[in-house]
């Protein structure tokens, strides 16, 4: 891997939450809402147990059924290790107590003392395999979005788009080539959303690999096209958006 790539990702990974936060706005107020939301960037290991519980409940409510029916399956322990990993970073949107708190970024506490989370994105700075025709190296620098979840009560307010915009902003600030993510094919609403945000199926996505290269298990279809069986049957896509 070229030393320049390694240096860029290492610099980004070493950036503190405070440093990363300087690139983000303090608050977000949706056009169709009177509620303002604080924007907090927190490393996975630094999340309080209360916030971890809140984030997990939101993730489980949104994704358990989809995951159980997929090849990825439902594995809470493995997923929690991924979420709270030392390289994980969270961008949290949390309701402010009142408009007067707007500049202070104080998030409203839930009725049981737990911090309310309207939406979150979890990402890492990383290297990923790159098969772009205009890219010579085998890997490139990316912001990989592992999760983007919005609470049901906060949907249709533009929060998903806002979070994607923040990931793109951070990717550009730290000179990452792409923002990338994995999306289940059955999650058609998410696929449509990311398409609207300018994402496309990446060349390393299983469906693209199936079109480009045969495997030992594959062969020719009736119309003479090669087929990579394992990849073609995969139930997810890898999406990306170029930012550099």
Map each language-model feature to its residues.
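Acetyl-CoA-dependent GNAT
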Residues: 10, 45-52, 56-153, 164, ...
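Conserved glycine-rich acetyl-CoA-binding loop
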Residues: 151-165, 174, 185-192, 196
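Conserved GNAT acetyl-CoA-binding A-motif
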Residues: 172-182
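Conserved acetyl-CoA-binding loop of GNAT-fold acetyltransferases
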Residues: 195-205
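Short proline/glycine-enriched turn/loop segments at secondary-structure junctions
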Residues: 207-231
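C-terminal helix/juxtamembrane-tail motif
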Residues: 227-244
């Amino acid at each position: 891997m070229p030393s320049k790539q390694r240096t860029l990702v290492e610099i980004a990974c070493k950036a503190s939450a405070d440093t990363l936060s300087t690139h983000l706005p303090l608050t977000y107020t949706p056009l169709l809402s009177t509620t303002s939301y604080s924007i907090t960037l927190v490393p996975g290991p630094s999340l309080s147990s209360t916030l971890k519980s809140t984030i997990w409940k939101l993730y489980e409510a949104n994704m358990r059924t989809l995951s159980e029916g997929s090849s990825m399956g439902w594995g809470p322990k493995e997923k929690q290790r991924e979420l709270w990993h030392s390289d994980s970073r969270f961008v949290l949107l949390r309701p402010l107590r009142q408009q007067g708190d707007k500049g202070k970024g104080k998030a409203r506490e839930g009725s049981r003392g737990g911090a309310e989370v309207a939406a979150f994105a979890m990402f890492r700075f990383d290297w990923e395999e790159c098969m772009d025709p205009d890219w010579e190296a085998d890997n490139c620098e990316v912001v990989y979005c592992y999760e983007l979840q919005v609470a049901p009560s906060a949907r249709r307010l533009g929060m998903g788009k806002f979070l994607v915009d923040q990931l793109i902003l951070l990717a550009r600030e730290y000179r990452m080539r792409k923002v990338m993510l994995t999306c289940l094919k059955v999650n058609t609403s998410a696929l449509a959303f990311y398409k609207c945000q300018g994402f496309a199926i990446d060349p390393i996505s299983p469906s693209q690999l199936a079109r480009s290269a045969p495997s030992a298990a594959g062969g020719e279809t009736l119309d003479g096209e090669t087929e990579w069986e394992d990849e073609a049957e995969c139930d997810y896509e890898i999406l990306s958006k170029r930012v550099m």
